[in-house]
């Protein structure tokens, strides 16, 4: 299950089951949606851009192609804690003269994930600590996701999704690659391929959603990672969670209490 070809479909299926459980127990209508990396497919389903069947099929192919690219390129990723984006970019610029390394996720202030060739990630661990990072932790992942090493997978994926219907969203999807609100189905179809080799702008996504009037967030799926990130992005944000029966019941009770 550790390989991305297995984890991606499993995580999405779990997330969609949690979403359907919430919808069956609570009469809520979302005003917007977003998802972090793989989670964007849950967002596309929520916005009625993709059917459940197509979302799962597409995710399975995405996972397969990313797994192939990961096996071919042997990349890695690392989390950088408590170092400015400016200092990170400065360090990466030095290493980019030797090969492919870049930012994968702008998760929240003080937490950035980098991605690229394994030997460069290993060098970055030392270099970014020297530049003042509190910690730089190489992640237990099977590849350099959201990097140029995934470009081949993205090109094949773009061909694959051509055969699927991406409807116009009934609500905006705040998309990973530039944090903009998108409803056009054709635009979203193009963006899902680009997302495979581009950074996830989560900090900007949440900031934009709050600026556009979103007041309450519900994190659907495995765990409470995004709730923690959201709190660091904006301390006023309220994020509920649905990932098991207990969290479902707690979220329903809280939503009813707060109307």
Question: For the regions a protein language model found, what residue spans apply to each?
Answer:
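FabD-like malonyl-/acyl-CoA
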Residues: 1-88, 139, 216-246, 250
